[in-house]
Amino acid sequence: MEFKVLAVGDVVGNPGLERVRRHLRQLKRKTGADFVVVNGENAAVVGITPNQAEDILDAGADVITMGNHTWGKREIVDYMEDCPQIIRPANYAPQVPGRGWQVFETKAGDVAVIDLIGRCNMDYGPDNPFLLIEKILKQITAKIILVEIHAEATSEKLAMGYLLDGRVSAVWGTHTHVPTADARILPKGTGYVTDLGMTGPRDSILGIRPDLSIAKFRGDLTERYRWAEGPTKMEAVLFTIDSATGKCIKTERVDEWD
């Protein structure tokens, strides 16, 4: 049977949350998605609160993934320990709270979701994701395996895609907030896209007010980032997977802009 996975780009600020609240279920119905993964690490611009996580789950997400802003809101720590539907990068140090991967029961059987963070131009010095993923895969028996890599470098994301080609169902990138036009199936049957994009203000610089971002580039370090207002967008990719083989049989961008 076909199993459709909707992967939604980073939710940015209140505009992104409002877009999710109003439109995620509609997009889920429109695409026929069976399983929805949303990156939520920028829901509070830097981090996510428990209430924001609940809003995203209530809107139709099955899993929330995180990234380099996982710990932006300290109140998420206890919530993350108690809620298996929110996962942080698996290659953070073993003692940090939360979980880096999780297996979920679905109509197509078990589905594993793994969250990784890249190391090129990223903070915190995480463990090597290319080595850790091998250890994780040895623990997973699910036929359908989904991997998100939250990374800056396109080459690092592509390398992860090719490393896992034929071994997992889909690999997608997040973090840059800019959607890439390379959604495809790799030679051995893994669905891939370098970056999903973002969910939030349409007329913005990565979700932030353009004037504030420009001020930073001009050298004004006193301005604080604030999300832009106005029309919004939701950028996402739909992966259609053969549940019998775990292979991806179709990839499709399903971006929606106001």
Regions found by a protein language model. Give the residues of each.
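Acidic, metal/ion-coordinating pockets
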Residues: M1-D258
